[in-house]
């Protein structure tokens, strides 16, 4: 049951505010291609997604939804850049992705929870290698999973940021593992939806 933001746990409320802002910046980036129809379609989709997120009360579900949407926008944008996705198709894919999120919510939420927990173990134990880790994570996230070498470069950069044997290393590796799985799961769902969405 959702009793509005007021009766919510403070942590969840704060998270919703933070995540809500990210959707606002998504509009700036993903709905400003200059293609009026596509931008309008994306603005609508992003507003819909944000409204959906604002109705959630479980923090891991919120994280899962945010990660899912963020990855959806990136993939749609990539499709648009490569002339594979137009406004109409983007709207359809976005709507179908929301259905797919509901259907796969259990798995996606579990992955988000595991990732968060693993990172908090890792995060408490280290701060020193943060720069290398940030660079490594960026590469690991956007290195195409097909491009294993780039993924490995990302992971090695991350590893060089701390001693792998330490608690933080194990936590972060686990976090990256779940992060990879999350990214992969989102990608598989997107690929499936895109395939079944003809305009």
Regions found by a protein language model. Give the residues of each.
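Short acidic, low-complexity intrinsically disordered linear motifs used
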Residues: 1-13
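Membrane-proximal, non-transmembrane alpha-helical segments
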Residues: 97, 101-107
């Amino acid at each position: 049951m959702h009793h509005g933001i007021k009766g919510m746990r403070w942590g969840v409320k704060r998270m919703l505010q933070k995540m809500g802002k990210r959707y606002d910046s998504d509009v700036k980036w993903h709905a400003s291609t200059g293609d009026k129809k596509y931008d309008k379609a994306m603005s609508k989709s992003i507003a819909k997604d944000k409204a959906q997120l604002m109705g959630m009360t479980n923090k891991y579900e919120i994280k899962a939804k945010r990660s899912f949407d963020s990855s959806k926008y990136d993939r749609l944008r990539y499709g648009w850049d490569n002339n594979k996705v137009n406004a109409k198709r983007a709207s359809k894919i976005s709507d179908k992705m929301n259905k797919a999120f509901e259907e796969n919510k259990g798995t996606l939420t579990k992955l988000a929870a595991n990732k968060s927990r693993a990172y908090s173990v890792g995060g408490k134990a280290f701060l020193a290698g943060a720069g290398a880790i940030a660079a490594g994570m960026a590469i690991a996230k956007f290195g195409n999973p097909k491009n294993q070498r780039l993924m490995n470069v990302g992971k090695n950069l991350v590893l060089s940021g701390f001693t792998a044997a330490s608690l933080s290393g194990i936590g972060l590796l686990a976090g990256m593992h779940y992060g990879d799985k999350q990214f992969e799961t989102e990608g598989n769902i997107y690929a499936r939806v895109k395939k079944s969405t003809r305009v």
